């Protein structure tokens, strides 16, 4: 625990004393301390007998911090304090029962049913005074997720999904008894808000073990509750280029993207790209894995027989539409929705570029232009898709060519990002003034053509640009 964090806790304790309140540290913060797990932006949970919302509001005022009520009915609020180089999230809640012991009894898993008085904690009496009535420390050492009471998933069905996110984050096993109860209670997940489901799903996707837990969630028939669209992907045969049906291929693609991310971990460019926040605390990494899993979601609807062959013409367009609907249901931001849709829509494009072995400058320019901010996501997705495709008609040569071309495109993208952007040779006013054009969609088309020719080195001056513009107008009359 850093000094600034400790000083903040001392301030909170002083304020609690002034209000004659006994504060307990509970749950995940204590669990993470026991695991020696340092978080760049700590979340600290507190509980007190009653009036947590009023306490939090007054504390926020004193600390000059942000404040929000999370759950008025159950007396939960949040205070957010910025400490030099980190955000500290402080959650306060009323006891769930009549006292701290009953509060711990009503928590989700043994590893989270931990508490200590804030005063004892700051006085260094951790091991002597830590409350651990359900063997949470023992379960932490054994690396297992275990429910506390039979009504745990009735009290909050989201805990069903949280069992998997905790297991994925920490590399723990869920006990057989807990899995058995989850199987019985899984239907209750339908009553949980989309936002809460999304957050736990993204926690799973953010780990290096997403593939394993998606497989387990599917085996337990939980994944189809979260993503019902995947059911029609099951057992859809894809023809001789594939060795797996659509759903199995989608799972295997997630497995491969996790391998690829590991291979690229030494690349600061790729690492920084994947760590970019797209919305709130959700990053490109999680969104990429969701895009990889959903890239062929349109295939069942697009499937046709033609000339004795199975084809999926237009599945990327159908899939992008389905992906947008999924994004809306999960309450993803507009930026996330657009990114997910682009990944699915353009996922075939790198393969087309790779088919030519040495794609032209024009083809590369158009790919980067069309895929925009998702150029790298689509390229990584394409690698995973290709590696998960091992039908009898695929060849070692074609696979190596795909890898070579896509790797070169990834390098080129980051190189171009670091280069100073070329100024435009002409703009709309130049076209109106020199070519006597009126404002119209034609101007946008001409400027797009000029930008492309400039990017691939075909024109280098304003004069050349205007000449090409004249030619473009003649050819498109």
Residues of each region from the PLM?
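Catalytic cores of the polymerase beta-like nucleotidyltransferase superfamily
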Residues: 1-477
């Amino acid at each position: 625990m850093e000094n600034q964090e400790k000083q903040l806790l001392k301030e909170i304790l002083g304020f609690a004393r002034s209000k004659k309140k006994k504060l307990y540290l509970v749950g995940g913060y204590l669990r993470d301390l026991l695991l020696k797990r340092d978080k760049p932006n700590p979340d600290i949970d507190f509980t007190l007998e009653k009036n947590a919302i009023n306490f939090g509001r007054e504390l926020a005022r004193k600390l000059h911090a942000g404040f929000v009520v999370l759950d008025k009915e159950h007396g939960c609020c949040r205070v957010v304090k910025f400490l030099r180089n980190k955000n500290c999230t402080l959650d306060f809640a009323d006891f769930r029962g009549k006292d701290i012991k009953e509060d711990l009894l009503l928590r989700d898993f043994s590893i989270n049913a931990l508490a200590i008085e804030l005063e004892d904690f700051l006085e260094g009496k951790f091991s002597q005074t830590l409350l651990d009535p359900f063997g949470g420390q023992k379960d932490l050492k054994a690396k297992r997720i275990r429910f506390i009471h039979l009504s745990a998933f009735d009290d909050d069905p989201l805990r069903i999904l949280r069992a998997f996110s905790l297991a994925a984050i920490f590399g723990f096993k869920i006990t057989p008894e807990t899995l058995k109860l989850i199987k019985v209670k899984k239907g209750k997940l339908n009553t949980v808000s989309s936002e809460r489901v999304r957050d736990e799903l993204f926690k799973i996707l953010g780990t290096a073990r997403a593939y394993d837990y998606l497989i387990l969630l599917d085996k337990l028939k939980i994944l189809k509750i979260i993503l019902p669209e995947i059911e029609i992907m099951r057992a859809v045969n894809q023809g001789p280029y594939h060795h797996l049906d659509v759903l199995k291929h989608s799972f295997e693609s997630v497995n491969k993207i996790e391998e690829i991310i590991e291979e690229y971990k030494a690349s600061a460019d790729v690492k920084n790209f994947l760590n970019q926040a797209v919305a709130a605390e959700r990053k490109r990494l999680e969104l990429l894995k969701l895009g990889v899993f959903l890239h062929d979601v349109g295939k069942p609807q697009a499937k046709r027989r033609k000339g004795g062959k199975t084809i999926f013409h237009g599945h990327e367009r159908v899939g992008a539409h389905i992906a947008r609907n999924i994004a809306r249901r999960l309450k993803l931001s507009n930026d996330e929705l657009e990114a997910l849709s682009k990944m699915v829509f353009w996922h075939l494009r790198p393969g087309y570029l790779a088919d030519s072995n040495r794609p032209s400058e024009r083809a590369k320019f158009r790919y980067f232009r069309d895929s925009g901010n998702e150029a790298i996501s689509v390229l990584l997705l394409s690698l995973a898709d290709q590696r998960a495709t091992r039908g009898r008609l695929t060849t070692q040569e074609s696979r190596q060519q795909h890898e070579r071309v896509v790797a070169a495109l990834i390098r080129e993208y980051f190189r171009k990002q670091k280069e100073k952007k070329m100024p435009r040779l002409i703009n709309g006013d130049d076209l109106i003034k020199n070519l006597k054009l009126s404002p119209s969609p034609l101007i946008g088309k001409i400027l797009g053509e000029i930008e492309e020719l400039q990017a691939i080195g075909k024109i280098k001056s304003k004069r050349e640009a205007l000449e090409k513009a004249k030619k473009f107008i003649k050819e498109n009359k």
